[in-house]
Amino acid sequence: MSYLIKPAGYKALLNLSQTEMGIKKIKDFFQQNLSSELRLRRVTAPLFVLKGMGINDDLNGTERAVTFPIKDLNDSKAEIVHSLAKWKRLTLADYHIEEGYGIYTDMNAIRSDEELGNLHSLYVDQWDWERVMSESERKIDFLKEIVRRIYAAMVRTEYLVYEMFPQIRPTLPQQIHFIHSEDLLQKYPTFTPKEREDAITKEYGAVFIIGIGCSLSNGEKHDGRAPDYDDWSTIAENGQTGLNGDLLVWDDVLNRSMELSSMGIRVNKEALLRQLDICKAGEKKELYFHKRLLSGELPQSIGGGIGQSRLCMFYLRKAHIGEIQASIWPEEMRKEARAAGMMLI
C-alpha cells in the first residue's frame, strides 16, 4: 500500500533546472570516485535475463519479476532484473577480472511489487558493483574497509554539492558508525527494525548495520535476504553472524533514516549450501548460476548496490524520490505531493 510523508513547511531548495544539473554532476562525480576507491571498471549491464537460470535477484523472496515472452526463442520467458547481484559475479568470471579489481554498472530495474512512497518507486536505478577478493579476506575488517571507502566517496560528493549550491550545507559525519543487528536489537529491544534503524542513524548520522538476513536472539531477522548472494550466515572472527549489511544516513528533510546501499561479502560454496538449506531452497542448486558457483567457476567477491536516485534525493534535500526520477505514481499521491510542495516528475 502506498504512503506519503509530508514534511511540514517543505519547500524545494532547487528549481527543476538546478535539480537536473545537480543530478548530472552528482552521478558523474560519485561514480568516478567509486571507481577510483574500489578499482572498478564500467561494464554494460542487461535490462532483462532469461527466467529459470537463477541469475535474477530474488530480493526478499516474495517480489514478482516483470516477465515477457520472446518470440524468437519459442516464447521462452525473460525477466526484467531486480538487481544484478548474481549477474555481476558471473561477469567477473567471464571477464577474468583479477583479485583486488572489479566492475560497476548503471543498473535499471522495475520492481512492480514495491509499496510506493517517498523512498520507493517502481523504477530502480543504482550503481551495481562487484569486486574480486581472496578467501582470506572473508572477514568483518575487510567488509568495513570497503564500506569506509564507499562512504569516503559519499562525503566528497556532498562537498561537491555544497560548492554548486551553497544553500545546501553538508550534514554527513566524517566517519561512519558500525553496529551489528544483534547489538542494535539489544540497544533497542522494544523497537521494530525500522524504529531501531531510525534511532541509531539519528544518533550517529551515518551507520552501517552488519548482519542482515540472519536470525537474531528474538527469533526474527532484522530484514530478509535471498540465500544466494550475500553471506549472512557465516560466523565472523568477532563471533557474530553475517558478512553483509546496509548503509544508512539520517535524512533531515523526512526526519528518518534513508538506506543508500546494501552490500556484502558473497557466499562461498559452504555458505551457499547452508543458506539454501536454511531457506528450504535446495532445488536452486540445479540452476545455472548455482551450478557454476558450486563447481568453483566463480571467484570469491564482495559487492552491492548504491541507489542513484536516493543518493541524489539526499544530496539535493528532496522530500520525494519522484522529484529526482520519472516514474508512475497514484494520482492521489501526485495531488497530495503537489499540495505539500513536492513536484513529482
Swiss-Prot record:
Query: Where in the cell does this protein reside?
Result: Cytoplasm
Report a single Gene Ontology molecular function.
aspartate-ammonia ligase activity
Which biological processes are named by the entry's GO terms?
L-asparagine biosynthetic process
Report the GO terms under cellular component. cytosol
This entry's Enzyme Commission designation comes to 6.3.1.1
| Involved pathway(s) | Amino-acid biosynthesis; L-asparagine biosynthesis; L-asparagine from L-aspartate (ammonia route): step 1/1
| Superkingdom classification of source | Bacteria
The keyword Oxidoreductase appears for this protein? no
Please state what the protein is called.
Aspartate--ammonia ligase
Instruction: Write down the species.
Output: Parabacteroides distasonis (strain ATCC 8503 / DSM 20701 / CIP 104284 / JCM 5825 / NCTC 11152)
